[in-house]
Amino acid sequence: MRLERLRIRGLRCLAEADIELGEGIHVFVGANGAGKTSVLEAAFLLSHGRSFRSGGAKEVLLQRGASSLSVFGEIRHQDGRIGRVGLGREGARWDARLDGRSASLGEVVSECAVVCFEPGSHALIAGGAEERRRYLDWGVFHVEHEFLLAWRRYQRALKQRNSLLRSNSPVAPELFLSWEAELSQTGERIHFMRVRYLDQLLPHLEQTIGGLLPELGAIELRYRRGWPEERDLAEVLADQRDRDLSRGHTTQGVHRAEWSISFEHAPMREHLSRGQEKLTALGCLLAQAALFASQKGEWPVVCLDDLASELDLAHQTAVVGQLAGVGAQVLVTGTELPAPLQSLSAHVFHVEQGKVAAPAIITS
């Protein structure tokens, strides 16, 4: 798939931008603070319903002085189908639109797939479990049609159980039973889909991370589902009810799951350098994109923010060459044109003080 048009209004320092995109590599060049990362952020918003940057709250996303923001994308799929997606915000909630009609956020993000490597991506490896669950569930969402409904049912039951746990008055035990049964049923389904996804992801991880970090040896994926193996979640929740009452929240379930990567020559995360964490995270994102392509028949849009600052020249060249070779649409930012792109065909946009100039086309 590729974004053919990206229209942005009121996002950070971008007052108004209407960007036409084509195939292949697109580079947004400008000084720090010019607004080039916000272009990638807009594409990511359409795919994830949130920002990849810290400070992604609505009031921070808004351009200073603006009361609303909107992002519109026109997406061409491999089969020629064109989807038009939009997200707007004026108040507390996102307003989502798909092909001109009101839609759920889930419908919009299912239409647009974007993966992004950026300065904070190392948190996928070095950060908390929530970041890794987000990565995992985004991938599962795009390949398992049942996932979104199961996830919504699970979240509703979790919210209801937590509400009972925080009640100021005593709660009859039988009031917990229906919500715990729902958590167990939907949690088992989510767990099964996650495990199946990780099994499918592993060969792609071996290829991408093995190419980026061959010195670390063989890769192993570890997954903990969030409650003890061989036990029914409903039984665990019943057993843990008193403990959860004292804490005011549900401490077991798929919302507590964790997965990690270990290496033959770096069995613990602490054995990785900061640079190796970044390359491992990059490998995870490229593997996820490759799995998406193998199952959907088209590559997601790949964003590489501040490429030259995040990767050395050899890894820049390898990644850009790989993505160009498979025909992915790639959006790159930098304070100048990254060296590996100078020998490739690319659309180069100059970004200055929140304005995006029409592209110059560099041909190899």
Locate the predicted segments by residue.
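Post-Walker A helix-loop "phosphate-sensing" segment adjacent to the P-loop in P-loop NTPases
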Residues: L45-A57, A287-Q295
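Nucleotide-state sensing region of NTPase/ATPase domains
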Residues: H48-E131, Y135-F147, D199-Q207, A238-D242
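Conserved lysine of the Walker
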Residues: K36
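Long, charged N-terminal accessory/stalk domains
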Residues: A123-L124, E130-L177, A181
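Structural recognition of the conserved hydrophobic beta-strand(s) that form the central parallel beta-sheet
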Residues: G73, Q329-T335
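Conserved NTPase motor "head" modules and their coupling/switch loops across ABC/AAA+ ATPases, GTPases
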Residues: M1-A31, V171-Q185, R189-V301, E310-Q329, ...
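Walker B catalytic acidic pair
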Residues: D305-L307
